[in-house]
Amino acid sequence: MEIGGSGAPPPLLLLPLLLLLGTGLLPASSHIETRAHAEERLLKRLFSGYNKWSRPVANISDVVLVRFGLSIAQLIDVDEKNQMMTTNVWVKQEWHDYKLRWDPGDYENVTSIRIPSELIWRPDIVLYNNADGDFAVTHLTKAHLFYDGRVQWTPPAIYKSSCSIDVTFFPFDQQNCTMKFGSWTYDKAKIDLVSMHSRVDQLDFWESGEWVIVDAVGTYNTRKYECCAEIYPDITYAFIIRRLPLFYTINLIIPCLLISCLTVLVFYLPSECGEKVTLCISVLLSLTVFLLLITEIIPSTSLVIPLIGEYLLFTMIFVTLSIVITVFVLNVHHRSPRTHTMPAWVRRVFLDIVPRLLFMKRPSVVKDNCRRLIESMHKMANAPRFWPEPESEPGILGDICNQGLSPAPTFCNRMDTAVETQPTCRSPSHKVPDLKTSEVEKASPCPSPGSCHPPNSSGAPVLIKARSLSVQHVPSSQEAAEGSIRCRSRSIQYCVSQDGAASLTESKPTGSPASLKTRPSQLPVSDQTSPCKCTCKEPSPVSPITVLKAGGTKAPPQHLPLSPALTRAVEGVQYIADHLKAEDTDFSVKEDWKYVAMVIDRIFLWMFIIVCLLGTVGLFLPPWLAGMI
């Protein structure tokens, strides 16, 4: 552009403006140029002839004092398997270099400058217990140089230091990891270390989610190594770190405790349900799957067994032992007299002594088939009882049941019409009649075989006793033609007076039901108003009746012949009674074995509860005593 061309201001107007700008900007620009020129001149003067390989001392005998400090920024990881601790730290170093001094007045009051650390001498301080990576600082940051020769250098570094990790109380463990810093080539006569602070600086520490630093103390040490005759100094920082157990408590400890509790419940489950072994195996499978999931969580080290590993092993043995004991208890529960005989000491210990110690009460389960059969017969007969009162005829029912017998019920057909007054039946031959085994009609029980009330002379009923005697009278052809005998059943119900009953109840039955015996003189005679079903025209001097079992101990018994049908019936009743008695005995012994199994279950229930509690206390007590909880 041409000066003075069209559109340009006149030169006379620009001249004052340029003068004003020049007077205002000239001092600042000259000052900036002067300071930059001063630093440039300073750097040229400091590094002209500077050798970074020689120690910064005036005399060869002087010692370079290096002030050393450590500031931790983050605890990255603690590897229990590889025994390493990874940290992010700032390595603070400070020393004096007499060759790097100047007078600030000569250089526009420049008191400090930042220079590349590669240009100056640096102490070769390394991490002695480095496990992986570089021993020294890899990122060479700039150093801060002061006019008096003091050099400050704080490079960042990520170290993987070796750490002897003790996982005995895992996850309630506390580790002591060290970081040892010192010069690798210079001994104490050349370089000596001085600690800046007694503790590690944690002002810029980023909190970890798994570990917390309890304390970090630095100590100064000197050591003479076998390789060299010189003494080498070092500063060792001890990091006391504690694991935060919340994650392991929720995901590791609580499930183990719950599995142990499930194992205890196995012994509280009744043996009758049949699910004890199923529950044991389910608990074992769940524990196995759980162990597969936590393999990566537990420190895989062979130096020591972690406490949680011991507890898991304890739980595994706990569950396995519960399966073995459950199988044994079920074997005891299903024992019977046919397979095992209960020893006397087992009965004494597990049925008498141990239940009292455990405050156990045996369930009242009683099975008496003999008496149940009698009761069912009473219900079928719709009668108060078949047998006399205990006080008037003691021991009849009890003796029958105790001997393994079951009294056969007697039934009789009631006539549709009222029974008229007729003479008693008399056999033409005055002998015991034959018993017929065919053409047996259905029988219905007497309405009240237990007691009959025939009217006396005054019309008032008199209490008499009842006897049911199984007979079958075969009438002769003449009697059948006359139609005087009307017997419809094998069983005839006789009602005798109290005097007659007393004579019959003086003695207890002593013989077998197969041999039915009585005295003919003691047989009751049918009353005219008897409710029984056989009515005759004429009385008989000797009653032709065959009784099941009657007679006393005073008079000699007389045996009467029985029909084959009655004999088979008595044998069947005896067989049923023997079978029911044996079944009652077997049932009683089986109940004893079941109760023994219940007692064993209760013993192991309390044992496993105590062991589970002791195992839980053993898991938490040692770390608590060590001050880690």
Curated annotation (Swiss-Prot):
Biased segments, Polar residues type: 504-529
Keyword presence, Calcium: yes
Binding-site residues for Ca(2+), renumbered to this chain: 78, 80
Residues that span the membrane, as ranges: 250-270, 279-299, 312-332, 604-624
Key words of the record: Calcium, Cell membrane, Disulfide bond, Glycoprotein, Ion channel, Ion transport, Ligand-gated ion channel, Lipoprotein, Membrane, Metal-binding, Palmitate, Phosphoprotein, Receptor, Signal, Synapse, Transmembrane, Transmembrane helix, Transport
Segments on the Cytoplasmic face: 333-603
Entry function: Component of neuronal acetylcholine receptors (nAChRs) that function as pentameric, ligand-gated cation channels with high calcium permeability among other activities. nAChRs are excitatory neurotrasnmitter receptors formed by a collection of nAChR subunits known to mediate synaptic transmission in the nervous system and the neuromuscular junction. Each nAchR subunit confers differential attributes to channel properties, including activation, deactivation and desensitization kinetics, pH sensitivity, cation permeability, and binding to allosteric modulators.
Entry protein name: Neuronal acetylcholine receptor subunit alpha-4
